[in-house]
Amino acid sequence: MPRWAVFAGVTALVLILLLALARASQLTVDGSVSSAVGADSHQPTDHRSHDGSMDPGSNGGATESIESSTAQFDAPTRPGALSPGALLANVALSQGLFAIVLLAGAWYAEIPPAALGVSAAPLSTGPPALGVGIAMGLGLYLVNELGTLGANAAGIETPDALRELLTPDSRSGWLILLVGVLPTIAVFEELLFRAALIGALAAGFPISPWLLAALSSIAFALGHGAQGTVGMVATGGLGFVLAGTFVVTGSLLVVVVAHYLVNALEFVVHEGLGVEFALGD
């Protein structure tokens, strides 16, 4: 017989620890960015416009191509900045450990897999679920890009310091990021914020899954404090869309795939390929 209260306690513990770690990470990122800015102030300025091209008055004057941006794979770490490898290892280990704790709690409390969004239904674990997840991921990424463009056009800064700090400085680092770290993040965060906080609690207690979706999205935003206020608002909105998708489909796989694609595309497009979109003047 499922012990819902036990699993709810484990979930609450993991959430509290995650939020505490997120707060500590926010302070670390803020310090690292400040150090990096201080170091950059002593370096020659690379004048670039917001669309990624060189300003005509700067040395070089030519537009930066997508191919040339691959040089950043081997770019050295800036003085005072945390090592991308150390940051990636910290993220993977901490979130991987939290995922193991949640899964162990679900096993101990005898939580049925269906309550966590895992069943034999095609829309849960079959090819249809994979297809829906891919479509959702691509759609959310496009919406995110359009939102960023709109915010920038309105003069609202959209911070990307955390993404830059996590960007690998080698090809092997990119492989680890895309194959190891980002999948771990997607699996853990969807397991916690969608499967546990919505699926399991709605199955075990008389609580509306839509109310749980709203509350879990707030917690999801708070867990991304290192992205700044604007980033938290955007993440909260993304979290609610993923939560709604989980409620409608009942599939953990769908939201994991969508979550992974949003993160992976942001890294590959902006940091890997060096592409920056901008509205026409």
Label the model's feature ranges:
Residues M1-G131, Y141, F267-D281:
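N-terminal, membrane-interfacial amphipathic/helix-forming hydrophobic leader that caps
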Residues P2-V10, A86-S94, P127-M136, G173-L177, ...:
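Alpha-helical transmembrane segments of integral membrane proteins
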Residues V14-I16, L162-D281:
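Transmembrane helix-loop-helix hairpins at the membrane interface
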Residues L19-G31, N144-L149, R194-A195, G199, ...:
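Short helix-terminus and kink motifs of transmembrane alpha helices
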Residues S49, M54-S58, A114, L130, ...:
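Generic detector of intrinsically disordered, low-complexity, polar/charged segments
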Residues A75-R78, L87-A89, I156-T158, L191-F193, ...:
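N-terminal start-of-chain detector that recognizes signal peptides
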Residues V101-L102, G147, I198, L242:
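Generic structural marker for isolated residues within well-ordered, non-membrane alpha-helices
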Residues W107-I185, I198, A203:
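Juxtamembrane helix-loop-helix connectors linking adjacent transmembrane helices
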